[in-house]
Design a protein with these regions (language model features):
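Catalytic Walker B motif of ABC-type/P-loop ATPase nucleotide-binding domains
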Residues: 160-163
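ABC ATPase "signature
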Residues: 219-220
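Conserved ABC ATPase signature
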Residues: 135-139
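Conserved ABC ATPase "signature" region
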Residues: 104, 108-131
Length: 260
């Protein structure tokens, strides 16, 4: 990975995604920078996963452009894909395989020489230094998700994509996974994650895009978003006699609550 921190690793410009007569993504634009965690925050069905799928090249988009590390993902899909890491679902792996066997398998798929030093570094990055010889099925749900994170970073991509990475985890496992995601930022990766958790968005994201009905409504840091849109949320905050929160802003902009 050789990219300057703060430079864009992903640029999404005016894309539309349509399934039959249903437009799932409508004129969406945003970018993700190296060393940044960017969150797509919205309820189920808002268009988050469809947007990620368009970036990954799994679904066609009707208009607009998507570039990853400068490569157009339609014109140069192989180069774009080589610069992208995707967190796989925990059900993607055989439970009888050992952790190191899974990592070696995917390093081979990615064309990466996973020597002993690199293997130990990957395990250290996800806090599983002592679990190399454990079977995947013996790991907790949070540990399994961390193995998926290691696979996403195994070829040192500039962009890492995480689709609701902590869904189904208990609070402690969620916090542990957030620490690992923040570690990706420190290493200079650009991270694009989707979430319907307000807590997750505020805990790990440098910038947030609120998305609803396939449209991006606002993009800011959590703090600036609260300040800029507090006028839309002051009545909601006053009703519970508290300060304006990001959730108040979300309700003010979309007209609906977002539950974790």
């Amino acid at each position: 990975m050789d990219i300057i921190k703060g430079s864009p690793v992903l640029q999404v410009q005016n894309i539309n995604v349509t399934y039959g007569n249903f437009k799932a993504v409508r004129d969406v634009s945003f970018d993700v920078k190296a060393g940044e965690i960017f969150g797509l925050l919205g309820p189920n069905g808002a268009g988050k996963t469809s947007t990620l799928s368009a970036v990954e090249g799994l679904v066609k988009y009707d208009a607009g452009t998507i570039t990853i590390a400068g490569f157009d993902n339609r014109k140069e899909p192989l180069n774009a894909r080589a610069n992208m890491g995707v967190q796989l679902q925990s059900t993607s792996f055989q439970t009888e395989l050992k952790v190191q066997e899974i990592l070696k398998l995917y390093s081979g798929i990615c064309g990466v020489d996973l020597n002993k030093q690199r293997l130990q570094q990957l395990l250290a990055d996800i806090g599983l230094e002592d679990s190399a010889h454990k079977k995947y099925g013996e790991l907790s749900g949070g540990q399994q998700q961390r193995v998926s994170l290691a696979i996403a970073t195994i070829h040192e991509p500039v962009l890492i994509m995480l689709d609701e990475p902590t869904t189904g985890l208990d609070p402690q496992s969620r916090r542990q996974l957030w620490e690992r995601i923040e570690g990706m930022r420190e290493k200079g990766h650009g991270v694009l994650l989707t979430t319907h958790s307000m807590e997750e968005a505020e805990a790990v994201c440098d910038r947030i895009a609120i998305i609803d009905h396939g449209r991006v409504i606002a993009i800011e840091t959590p703090e600036i978003m609260i300040e800029k849109h507090k006028g839309d949320a002051e009545v909601i905050a006053a009703s519970r006699k508290g300060k304006v929160t990001l959730e108040d802003v979300f309700i003010g902009l979309t007209g609906k609550a977002l539950r974790n």
